[in-house]
Design a protein with these regions (language model features):
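N-terminal pre-ligand scaffold of iron-sulfur
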Residues: 13, 27-101, 105-110, 139-166
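Residue-level signal for the membrane-embedded core of alpha-helical transmembrane segments
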Residues: 19-26
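A generic helix-loop boundary/linker signal
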Residues: 1-2, 90, 117
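Extracellular/periplasmic metallocenter environments
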Residues: 99-139
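N-terminal secretory signal peptides and thylakoid transit peptides that target proteins
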Residues: 1-19
Length: 166
């Protein structure tokens, strides 16, 4: 065999390797893009609520990821609970997923209590079980406080502190 045909074989082998490597990189990029969530899905994961517009004693309900979220600005006569209250400035809030932890019914709010009509479960104004079959307090959605805004779906230090206590 001549030197020229060995050089030609080496060149063809290196060319094939380079094309295969480039194709592999393009394939990896396409796989990553396919696995990443769509921007519309990412945007749907966050809900922002302006807490400065809330009135003490009045329940506000927003939707986050197709679930009802209860936001209650506590009045001075409501029991303060440092283990579960969300504190923003001088105000205290109950922020919880508005589903009974027994079977997932949506409780109503009356006389400073959340009452589940399905099986008689009662939660206090902080979302803790007072009576009935619910096995635990109402769940707290991940949140972050940004000034007077509550950002649902994003984990902040306030949420981490509450979850450590529960």
């Amino acid at each position: 065999m001549s030197i020229k045909s060995e050089e030609r074989r080496d060149f063809i082998g290196l060319s094939f390797g380079a094309v295969a490597a480039a194709g592999g990189l393009v394939g990896l990029g396409a796989m990553k893009q396919a696995w990443d969530p769509l921007p519309s899905v990412k945007a749907a994961g966050f809900t922002t609520v302006d807490l400065s517009a809330t009135t003490a004693g009045e329940l506000y309900q927003v939707e986050w990821r197709k679930k009802p979220i209860f936001i209650l600005k506590k009045t001075a006569d409501m029991k303060a609970d440092d283990t579960i209250d969300v504190v923003v400035g001088d105000d205290r809030y109950t922020v919880c997923i508005g589903l009974c932890t027994h079977l997932g019914c949506i409780p109503s709010y009356k006389n400073n209590q959340f009452i589940c009509a399905c099986h008689g479960g009662i939660f206090d104004e902080s979302g803790k079980v007072v009576f009935g079959p619910p096995p635990r307090a109402m769940d707290i959605p991940p949140f972050k406080i940004d000034g007077t805004r509550l950002v649902l779906g994003e984990t902040g230090p306030e949420y981490e502190k509450l979850i450590a206590n529960v």
